[in-house]
Each structure stands twice: as structure tokens, then as C-alpha cells.
């Protein structure tokens, strides 16, 4: 059932089978101290009025680092981002709380719009009033629920001293792997329900991301994000029906692209020529060098790729060097996955890039034209999608 299906089943059973006053959501790949649960429970009990109590995220592989302190929604691009005054990736080992100069922001109040479901305690009253999560499988179900709860009078607080350890986003490829489909599709679904006004900021951020993916030879990412737009435009019933089939569909699509095929090691391929190694080391640091690098990347992408580099890589890049300014100037390189489990062989294909770009532009144009219609459609279906009855049909409960 994935994230939202699993979380929805938890809430459904908690409401049906127990009289528990709270539902605690946590990821299954975290490390936690029991004190965090006790603190979340204590704060929930003593809150003046019911509220969602969220935990912060510490870096599982660098345990003194506070990876996520508190987040809000950027209502222009409709994307989550760090809340004002938060300290991103704060290292308590180097700057403890008593360090007044470097830790002062950790002592101030941080207001958030929601909290990730790596750890979040939800009052029973909230669930009984606003319903279950949306059938989104993974990504954005937590934010949709927080925004819905806030509208119903149940705010979220992310509390210092309540936290879990979780793998940092920088150690994952979820912005470019199969999860990229759910990131975009569900972002559009939630925006249609909770975003007011123009979507120009959303479309601008989408266009920028697509251009970056194409320059980085991430063709599979663009292909599945195009599919995400199509599935969003197909409507809420279609999105719910996709719960059991979306992941295998996306996995099959990705297999058609070399950038999505993970090889155990770069040694599976011929030794690199090394001619593109320097591109990953020379990071543009000022506007002039950035413009020059962008120009070189665009010019390179307008030319047909040299087929030799689809047989012998020009370089092996670690994730930190696999950026637009390096990948945009090559025809074929291997890139290590963020989690280190292997490499992908990214191969530039001008015709494929142009086809994906045209497809994306046409879909974005349709999205702009039809978004007011989709906004009405998704809002009309919202109550049904989050109802116990809807989820009973998904679960196969008579």
C-alpha cells in the first residue's frame, strides 16, 4: 500500500479498533529514542487545544547533525522549504546549544506549516473530524493532511527535543528516481486542493527543474514527470485507481532509459577516457563563469552525441560532481548513486532530449489551461477520497 495506504490503514484501525486519543506516525527506516515519543505525548496532552505534534529530523549517518528543523510551504512555487530562521544541517557536536553565537536560532520559536510523517502525533479528534489521508501512495500525503488540519483549526508544531534519526535527503536520489513521479503528481494534486490564485510560480519551477534534468541527462526523470502531469489531468478517480499500479508502471518506463539502470560498479564498463573529469572539478562560482558554463552546456546539447562515448565513458562522477555544469558538457559518463549502491551510465541523446522537452512543454501548456477545471474537480472529490468508506473499498473491506 505504500506510505499513504499504510498510514491510512493505521489511522483507520486506530479509530475503529481502539479508543486511543492519539495516532503516532513514524517511518519504518528511522532510529528513535523512546523519550521522543513520551515528550510528544506529554506536549499533546498539555496543549491548550488539540494540535499535531511533529518531531525534527536528525541525520542517521551523521548523528549530531540536525537535518530538518522545521518547514513551511512556499506558496508561490507550492513546494516545501525551510521555515524562516531555521538552521539547516546544524552540527551539535561543533556548535552545541550553549554556543550563543552559532546556535542562537535554535532557541527561538519556529512556526511551521506542517511536519513530515517521519514522526508526527495526530489527535484522534482531528482524524475523526477531517478524515483519513489522501490516496497518494507516497509523497505529499503528510503535507496535504497538515494543510487540511490547519484549515479545520488544528495547527502543527515541530518541537525541539522531539526527533528521530533518518537518512538525509542528500543521501538519496528521490528527486530523480521513481519517486520523482509521485513528487510532481501529488504536488499538483495537493496544489489543486489547497493553493489559491495563479499557478505561474508552480509552472516556472517545473520548467526550471525540467531544463536542469535534461542538461543532467536525467531523461527518465523527465519522462515519468510527464506521465505525472498526464495522470493528474486524468482526475481524482484515476489517481485513486492507480494506487496498486502506479509504481510498476513507472518502474517499467524507467527501464527504457540508461540513466535509470543501476550497474553494480563502474568496472562493469570499459575504463574511462578521463577527458571529462575536469568538468566535475571546475565548479562555476560567480555569475560570469556560470553563464559561460551554461552556454557551453546548451551548445553541447544542440549537437549530436559522439557514439563512442556511449561505449566508453568520458569520466566517473561522484554525486557531488554530477551537476548541470559538468553533465551538460558530456556525451557519456557514469554517475555514482547517492546511496553508493552502484552507478548509472548517463548518455546524451539529442533527439530524445528534444522529444521529451516538446512533450513537457505541451503538457505544461495543457496544465495551465485546465488547472482551474482540475481545481474544482479535485476539491469536489476531496471529501470522498479521504473518507473511511473510500479507504474501505481500497482495503477490500466489506
Locate each region found by the language model.
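Terminal low-complexity segments of carbohydrate-biosynthetic enzymes
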Residues: 185-398
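Active-site nucleotide-sugar/metal-binding loop of Leloir-type enzymes
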Residues: 9-22
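Donor nucleotide-sugar recognition loop
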Residues: 111-119, 124, 128-147, 153-159, ...
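A short, glycine-/small-residue-rich helix N-cap motif at loop->alpha-helix starts
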Residues: 1-9, 31-33, 139
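A recurrent flexible, glycine/aromatic-enriched loop bordering the glycosyltransferase active site
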Residues: 85-119
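Conserved donor NDP-sugar-binding/catalytic core segment of glycosyltransferases
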Residues: 34-88
